[in-house]
Amino acid sequence: MIQYCNLCSEEFALHARGRVPTDIWRIWEDGIFENFEAPIWRELWSEVAKEYRSYEPFWQFMNELVARAANKSQFDT
């Protein structure tokens, strides 16, 4: 999970710096969201989230994404 979240944070940072076009970022973001629709991914995020607290923009992005994924998951069942 840490390795995957590290990759996600790098992708997030590249987009934030304008190094990745928005259309590509949206594809990556959709993929991250799809993974976190699974409850196990959300549980694991809650365990590793503290590791990303020092990178506030990414930490906030992930918390919002995980909340959206949980909400969508709740209505899909």
Outline where the language-model segments fall.
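Amphipathic alpha-helical "stem/stalk" segments
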Residues: 1-77
